[in-house]
């Protein structure tokens, strides 16, 4: 498995994974918009030259923000999501010097929530009716080891 930065040639594969993974996939314009603003926060996982997963992030008020993480169904359970998340965490904590990483996850997405708990994320706040279909989200955070200073969240 190879983890590398996203490039425009990966767009079709990322969109396919996004559609497979989420009830309401992000539109192409949003994916490309985040990439243009945060090119260091978008990675793909490749196996045998095929994109099988991706992670997309941004940075807000000095925090890392995970926008989307998905792996092709037939490739789940192989450590791809973990490798992608660790890659983006490394960028946020060690290069961008963020003290916190935040993300939102559907209350009903128990598998994703368990994954993030295993990776050191904790529930911070319930976000009522966050998604277009009215489902609540949970705001989760991970603090950089030995980080000092408050968590500043403006979106929520």
UniProtKB/Swiss-Prot annotation:
Keyword flag Transferase: yes
Location in the cell: Cytoplasm
An example Gene Ontology CC term for this record: NatA complex
Molecular-function annotations in GO: protein-N-terminal amino-acid acetyltransferase activity
EC number(s) per entry: 2.3.1.-
Coiled-coil region(s): none
EC class: transferase
Domain N-acetyltransferase: 1-145
Presence of the UniProt keyword Acyltransferase in the record: yes
Keyword list, A-Z: Acyltransferase, Cytoplasm, Transferase
Gene3D superfamilies per UniProt: 3.40.630.30
Similarity section: Belongs to the acetyltransferase family.
NCBIfam families, A to Z: rimI (TIGR01575)
This protein's name: Uncharacterized N-acetyltransferase MJ1530
Organism in which the protein naturally occurs: Methanocaldococcus jannaschii (strain ATCC 43067 / DSM 2661 / JAL-1 / JCM 10045 / NBRC 100440) (Methanococcus jannaschii)
């Amino acid at each position: 498995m190879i983890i590398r930065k996203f490039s425009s040639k990966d767009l079709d594969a990322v969109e396919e994974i996004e559609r497979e993974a989420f009830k309401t996939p992000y539109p192409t314009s949003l994916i490309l918009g985040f990439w243009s603003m945060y090119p260091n926060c978008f990675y793909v996982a490749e196996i045998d030259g095929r994109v099988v997963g991706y992670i997309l992030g941004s940075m807000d008020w000095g925090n890392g923000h995970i926008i989307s993480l998905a792996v092709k169904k037939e490739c789940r359970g192989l450590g791809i999501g973990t490798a992608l998340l660790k890659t983006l965490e490394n960028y946020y904590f060690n290069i961008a010097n963020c003290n916190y990483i935040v993300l939102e996850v559907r209350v009903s997405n128990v598998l994703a929530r368990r994954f993030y708990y295993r990776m050191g994320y904790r529930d911070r706040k319930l976000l009522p009716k966050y998604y277009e279909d009215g489902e609540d989200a949970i705001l989760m955070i991970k603090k950089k080891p030995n980080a000092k200073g408050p968590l500043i969240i403006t979106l929520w």
